[in-house]
């Protein structure tokens, strides 16, 4: 990497670190990230059909924070853990042969077909620096992640298998999915299954809904 690229990368990292420290807009109250009994019943109803919506789509329809919807998914459709599990989960995603990374910003959605880059914590800040050997790179703030949820369910456009990362806004920061296909390669499904199995070795973030 040349000197100009290094300077640009360093500047970007500094800006991201400052932005991360200022992150406090509209957090969801710590005790309100799991559904109560009434909310759980509404979420179960939203996921009772033949196809399941993405959590952010169900959240908009139900008028609930997305992280609450994710926390209320029936056990057969997913598993959620505390955000402190980031490094173990991200390392597992790095073993996937291929992925689609979904990033939402307001009403906009970016989808990047890429191998999930590995990375390591910065020695100078709270950033987790992604490697530069994939189509996607960047700098994450895993200390701000409050929840990680895997979902596996039949969707309107095919079976979805993915992992969402949430912060205290109650919205997903990003999602990592098995690329959509009528019959995805067995290696991709197996890689997702390993990540899901890892998540299931950890305590669930919310009480397990039935189903």
Write out the residue ranges for each language-model feature.
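Bacterial N-terminal signal peptides that target proteins for export
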Residues: 1-10
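Eukaryotic intrinsically disordered, low-complexity regulatory linkers and tails enriched in Ser/Thr/Pro
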Residues: 23-211
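Bacterial N-terminal signal peptides
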Residues: 9-18
């Amino acid at each position: 990497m040349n000197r100009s690229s290094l300077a640009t990368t360093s500047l970007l990292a500094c800006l991201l670190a400052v932005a991360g420290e200022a992150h406090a807009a509209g957090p969801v109250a710590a005790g309100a990230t799991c559904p109560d009994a009434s909310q759980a019943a509404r979420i179960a109803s939203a996921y009772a059909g033949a196809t399941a919506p993405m959590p952010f789509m169900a959240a908009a329809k139900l008028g609930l924070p997305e992280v609450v919807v994710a926390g209320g998914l029936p056990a057969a459709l997913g598993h959620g853990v505390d955000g402190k599990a980031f490094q173990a989960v991200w390392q597992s995603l790095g073993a996937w042969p291929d992925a689609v990374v979904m990033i939402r910003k307001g009403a906009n959605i970016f989808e990047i077909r890429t191998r999930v880059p590995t990375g390591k914590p910065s020695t100078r800040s709270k950033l987790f620096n992604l490697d530069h050997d994939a189509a996607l790179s960047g700098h994450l703030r895993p200390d701000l992640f409050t929840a990680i949820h895997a979902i596996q369910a039949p969707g309107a456009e095919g079976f979805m298998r993915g992992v969402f990362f949430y912060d205290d806004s109650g919205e997903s920061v990003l999602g990592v999915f098995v690329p959509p296909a009528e019959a995805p390669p067995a290696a991709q499904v197996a890689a997702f299954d390993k990540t899901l199995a890892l998540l299931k070795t950890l305590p669930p973030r919310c009480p397990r809904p039935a189903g």
